[in-house]
């Protein structure tokens, strides 16, 4: 069975954990291929148990599934160990989790620099989570990063940390007026943490490709979303990695010809956390309604999410840049009880109608949504398990989103639970 990529098609927080959990029983492997603990996903099990994960793939909650933190991920050792301990305390078997030897480690100096930089920028800040993700990726690209495998060689680790702090301590002390970090203290801290995860380090590229050769099913799970991609997102208000489908091959070591399906996750309205343009953002009672009904609070940051109507311009763009074959539409139940449900079908920019993503940052900031209104529905749809059980207006809304997005909507979420899903097409079929 070829690999499947799971992509957030908006600004993240679309409900990717629910999709992974739904497919989990038919998967052998789940791979996280980019990002770090700057994003979170929530999974609600049939018994009502809720798990919030930030670094570990959500397949960890499905017995028998092997999970991989891939080479494209940046790993905070402390967060990894805390998350493992939290899962094990709730009797989750974590023995099947592997960690790529080539993933990069978030070091204490990355976190320190990230936090003080955001404070220094003031109202010009990008809105990072302050968890060291960006600085770690900077070191990776500059070829001065610390990789997971380095914890297996104390001499190499010490050399890398000493070289890094020779420069970074200058930045912390002379620019930000902060205390210098002691290289040996940093090394000792990381080596101490490594004692608890060294047995998980592996050549995950080899293991994943061998699994595909055996006919096993591999899900490549992205974090965040298309519009946060460092290349294809609303730059500079983006993350430091590639959540789009192209990043799945690079961040896992699986060749693109092994990928057969790209499953995009779309929320039936739009949300965003942090700074940056958001054409359909609502500042009225409807925005409050979506936030309250949808429980729109960031899993990782605890920050309230900005809410707006569905943006078909963004959805079309996500379909194109990811090669999305199928969509999983989430949170349709949140829209119940609205008399009318607007859909942004295009933008007005400087008096012109624009149906594709604007080319420049300035144009996107000036974009005003052009809405098409659909009739709403009052019924509680949380018990629907077939498309035909949905109210006629809800069915019409889904079909219109499918038409505007340019890919079929194969699954529909009608509640947070694993079983609260309508499957129109089998994405693993």
Swiss-Prot record:
Positions with a binding annotation for Mg(2+): 13, 40
Annotated EC: 6.3.4.4
BP terms from Gene Ontology: 'de novo' AMP biosynthetic process; IMP metabolic process
Residues given in the record as substrate binding sites: 299-305
The protein, known as: Adenylosuccinate synthetase
Gene3D superfamilies: Adenylosuccinate Synthetase, subunit A, domain 1, Adenylosuccinate Synthetase, subunit A, domain 2, Adenylosuccinate Synthetase, subunit A, domain 3
Xref: SUPFAM superfamilies: P-loop containing nucleoside triphosphate hydrolases
SMART domains: Adenylsucc_synt
Residues that hold IMP according to the record: 13-16, 38-41, 129, 143, 224, 239, 303
Subunit structure: Homodimer.
Keywords: Cytoplasm, GTP-binding, Ligase, Magnesium, Metal-binding, Nucleotide-binding, Purine biosynthesis
UniProt function note: Plays an important role in the de novo pathway of purine nucleotide biosynthesis. Catalyzes the first committed step in the biosynthesis of AMP from IMP.
Cofactor(s) listed in the protein's UniProt record: Mg(2+)
Cofactor note: Binds 1 Mg(2+) ion per subunit.
GO CC aspect terms: cytoplasm
Active site per database record: 13, 41
Enzymatic class: ligase
Catalytic activity: IMP + L-aspartate + GTP = N(6)-(1,2-dicarboxyethyl)-AMP + GDP + phosphate + 2 H(+)
Family: Belongs to the adenylosuccinate synthetase family.
Natural source organism: Nocardia farcinica (strain IFM 10152)
């Amino acid at each position: 069975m070829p690999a499947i990529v799971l992509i957030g098609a908006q600004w993240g927080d679309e409900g990717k954990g629910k999709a992974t959990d739904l497919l989990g029983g038919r998967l052998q492997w789940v791979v996280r291929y980019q990002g770090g603990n700057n994003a979170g996903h929530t999974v609600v099990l049939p018994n009502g148990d809720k798990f919030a994960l930030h670094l570990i793939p959500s397949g960890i909650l499905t017995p028998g599934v092997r999970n991989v933190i891939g080479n494209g991920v940046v790993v905070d050792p402390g967060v990894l160990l805390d998350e493992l301990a939290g899962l094990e305390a709730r009797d989750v078997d974590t023995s099947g989790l592997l960690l790529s030897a080539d993933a990069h480690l978030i070091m204490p100096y990355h976190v320190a620099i990230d936090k003080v930089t955001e404070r220094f920028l003031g109202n010009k800040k990008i809105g990072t989570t302050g968890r060291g993700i960006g600085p770690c990726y900077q070191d990776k690209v500059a070829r001065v990063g610390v990789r997971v495998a380095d914890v297996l060689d104390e001499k190499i680790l010490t050399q890398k940390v000493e070289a890094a702090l020779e420069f970074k301590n200058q930045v912390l002390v002379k620019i930000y007026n902060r205390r210098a970090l002691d290289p040996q203290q940093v090394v000792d801290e990381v080596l101490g943490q490594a004692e608890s995860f060294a047995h998980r380090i592996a050549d995950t590229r080899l293991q994943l490709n061998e699994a595909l050769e055996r006919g096993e099913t591999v899900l490549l799970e992205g974090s965040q979303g298309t519009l946060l991609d460092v290349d294809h997102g609303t730059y500079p208000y983006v993350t430091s990695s590639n959540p789009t489908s192209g990043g799945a091959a690079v961040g896992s070591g699986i060749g693109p010809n092994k990928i057969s399906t790209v499953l995009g996750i779309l929320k039936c309205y739009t949300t965003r956390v942090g700074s940056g343009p958001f054409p359909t953002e609502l500042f009225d009672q409807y925005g409050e309604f979506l936030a309250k009904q949808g429980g729109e609070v960031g899993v990782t940051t605890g920050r309230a999410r900005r809410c707006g109507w569905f943006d078909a311009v963004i959805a079309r763009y996500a379909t194109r840049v990811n090669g999305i074959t199928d969509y999983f539409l989430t949170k349709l139940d949140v829209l119940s009880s609205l008399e009318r449900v607007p859909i942004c079908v295009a933008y007005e920019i400087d008096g012109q109608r624009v149906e594709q993503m604007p080319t420049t940052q300035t144009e996107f900031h000036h974009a005003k949504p052009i809405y098409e209104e659909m009739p709403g529905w009052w019924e509680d749809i949380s018990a629907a398990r077939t498309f035909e059980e949905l109210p006629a207006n809800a069915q019409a809304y889904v079909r219109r989103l499918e038409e505007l997005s340019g890919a079929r909507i194969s699954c529909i979420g009608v509640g947070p639970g694993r079983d609260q899903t309508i499957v129109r097409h089998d994405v693993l079929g």
